[in-house]
A protein has these predicted regions:
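Acidic, Ser/Thr/Pro-rich intrinsically disordered cytosolic tails and loops
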Residues: 2-160
Length: 160
């Protein structure tokens, strides 16, 4: 189970939502909220950032990027909806976007992982919800800023 920080509501523009139909959006956001026991606004932000992350992958096919823990929750949810995910990948990327946690560990070691992903998103004019990429962290808790296997895959080793 993922724990979400409880704070005052944050107004974040959902700029990537248009990459999928309203019906698919509703299905994915509801799935995340239910499965992770979180409030809908946070589930919406997670899904929006997941779509932005996947768009980045499509825009930069020769590079590999690392999702944050929170974005990985959205990616896992999308992967569970195979038809919708496959259609999205074909439409946005021209081919399937694979999720490879092992590859993510190599990226983290080579490029700085999430920090580099956020830089690339901004460079490609993809809106970044900073809280989902930084404040909730992607580190293993020892303070050195390095990701570990469980954080690269969304925490607790689920689904890897």
């Amino acid at each position: 189970m993922t724990t979400i920080i409880s704070e005052a509501p944050v107004c974040v523009e959902l700029t990537n939502k248009s990459l999928i139909s309203d019906q698919v959006w509703e299905r994915l956001v509801s799935y995340i909220a239910k499965e992770k026991d979180m409030e809908r606004p946070i589930a919406e932000r997670i899904m929006d950032q997941t779509l932005g992350f996947l768009k980045l992958i499509a825009l930069s096919p020769s590079r590999t990027f690392c999702p944050s823990k929170m974005v990985d929750i959205g990616w896992h949810a999308f992967l569970m909806h195979t038809r919708e995910y496959f259609e999205f990948c074909e439409r946005v990327n021209g081919q399937y976007i694979h999720h490879d946690p092992t590859e993510v560990l190599v990226v983290v070691a080579r490029t700085g992982g999430v920090t580099e992903t956020v830089r690339a998103m901004k460079a490609n004019s993809i809106t970044v919800d900073e809280m989902l990429w930084t404040a909730l962290g992607d580190c293993d808790g020892d303070g050195d800023g390095s990701c570990d296997a469980s954080s690269a895959c969304g925490g607790e080793g689920e689904g890897c």
